[in-house]
Amino acid sequence: MGAPIVKTAAGDVELEERGRGTPVVVVHGSPGGIDAGRAMDRFLPEDRFRIITLSRPGYLGTPLGADDASIDHEADLLAAVLDSLGVDRASVFAWSGGGPSAYRLAVRQPERVASLIAVAAVSARYEAPAPSASDRFLFGTGAGQWLIGFLARRAPGQVVEGALSGEGSIRGDELKALTASVMADPEQRAAVLAFSATVGTNGARKAGWENDLANFAAIGSLELDRVRCPVLLIHGEADTDVAIDFSHSAHAVLPESQLIVMNQGTHLAFYADPNAADIQEKTRAFLAANS
């Protein structure tokens, strides 16, 4: 399900907001879209947070900038979203490929960002690993996306195990145990299955995905040393999508940051891990203390 297209000073954006309380902008990863943002923000209670979720440029209903498809333009679009909603200052919750524009927003408009949560986030030059033939089919074709949806309904455990193995280095008994743990937890199972429907690199996500790959490979510096807000970094040590080195190096440069390392955590650890509920509660507390 899509969302309204809102006109801002920096361009059109697919956008929705709900809840009341501390404003939080949710910046999805690569690939993704507003549906991925909804899966990300499910841990934020609507009676405590004003949740602002969107599709980044090139994903679903948000077009790429006609003249500027840069990371900085995306950061300016996030600021324009705040303007359009009458929000002076907000926290930002970014995952994976949402990291670069979130960091640049904090650099370019520091007065607008109260705090930043960066989960398994890209923080420097990044080149995505070459996809396998099976990944090209599953994520890059309509037939592959249909198959993932079919399996999510008929064999959800297979989808969950595939997602965990594809996003981390754990194997064998550890993978089986983690899969069983996720399948036994309704929230974690639902989160992984929701994300599985948002990771296509074709169709309405293709332009955003290809733009992200080009932009991330060309990163020189995101100027993290200029970020002035408190930053909470969260990363799984077994992440094979965005290596934990990205968060270690960001933590070393950011003026005010905390780093939580999730033992044997995959790229999905914030949502699918034995410690996920505890980490999510720490994140809510961080937002409340730095709003």
Each language-model region and where it sits:
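Catalytic active-site module of serine/aspartate enzymes centered on a nucleophile-bearing elbow/loop
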Residues: 257-291
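Flexible "cap/lid" loop of the alpha/beta hydrolase fold
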Residues: 116-147
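Short beta-strand/loop motif that positions the catalytic acidic residue
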Residues: 227, 233-235, 239
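Alpha/beta-hydrolase
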Residues: 136-222
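Conserved acidic catalytic loop of the alpha/beta-hydrolase fold
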Residues: 73-90
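Conserved HGGG/HGGXW glycine-rich cap/lid loop of the alpha/beta-hydrolase fold
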Residues: 14-63
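Gly/Ala-rich beta-loop-alpha elbow adjacent to hydrolase catalytic centers
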Residues: 94-98, 102
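Conserved alpha/beta-hydrolase "acid-adjacent" motif
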Residues: 240-246
